[in-house]
């Protein structure tokens, strides 16, 4: 099915077109949902919420950019709005002490273990870490997305890195 035709049918609330859109893109958007969620159940809920938003806003898509990129942006925004609404993002005080980086020492950890550790981070740290490290957003962009200051974004990132570093060190100690 041609993309323009698919979008037109989705705007008209054609269920078969919506189902086709879901089958075609769900696996890609699910990966994004996993990055921002604590577990698979929450990721699935976020995926469904994202598709509901996509179906509602699909008529607003302008063919100026990538349709897939537009859907990814909708997905991230839907998840962030959910966390803001549920008050997952309690701001840290602005005078939060910045964390000092430990001397760099490479630590080996499997990708699955690292992803598990990222999912275990408190929401505000996980969201900031994902947006900055995995998605390449600046602290200014993150602060706009999350409704915080750039200082809070930097503090949350530093704290996320510290927590991850400690989890990796503890794993290494437990294995030895």
Model-inferred region functions:
Residues 5, 9, 144-147, 161-176:
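C-terminal edge and immediately downstream basic/flexible tail or linker adjoining helix-turn-helix-like DNA-binding
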Residues 7-29:
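A short, charge-rich alpha-helical start-of-domain segment used by transcription regulators
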Residues 11, 48-66, 85-86:
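Sigma70-family region 2
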Residues 22-40, 57, 118, 167-170:
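Amphipathic, Lys/Arg- and hydrophobic-enriched alpha-helical face
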Residues 31, 45-52, 65-77:
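Structural recognition of an alpha-helix C-terminal capping motif at a helix-to-coil junction
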Residues 59-63, 73-93, 159:
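Arg/Lys-rich amphipathic alpha helix in sigma70-family domain 2
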Residues 81, 85-112, 116, 138:
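Internal acidic/polar
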Residues 128-132:
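A short pre-motif secondary-structure segment
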């Amino acid at each position: 099915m041609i993309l323009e035709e698919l979008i037109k049918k989705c705007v008209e609330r054609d269920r078969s077109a919506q189902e086709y859109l879901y089958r075609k893109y769900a696996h890609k958007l699910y990966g994004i949902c996993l990055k921002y969620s604590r577990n698979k159940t929450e990721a699935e809920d976020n995926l469904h919420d994202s598709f509901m938003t996509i179906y509602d806003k699909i008529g607003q898509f302008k063919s100026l950019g990538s349709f897939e990129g537009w859907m990814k942006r909708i997905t991230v925004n839907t998840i962030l709005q959910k966390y803001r609404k549920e008050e997952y993002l309690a701001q840290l005080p602005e005078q939060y002490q910045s964390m000092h980086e430990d001397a760099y020492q490479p630590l080996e950890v499997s990708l699955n273990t690292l992803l598990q550790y990222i999912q275990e981070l408190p929401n505000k740290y996980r969201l900031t870490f994902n947006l900055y490290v995995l998605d390449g957003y600046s602290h200014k962009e993150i602060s706009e997305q999350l409704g915080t200051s750039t200082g809070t974004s930097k503090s949350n990132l530093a704290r996320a890195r510290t927590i991850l570093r400690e989890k990796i060190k503890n794993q290494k100690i437990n294995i030895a």
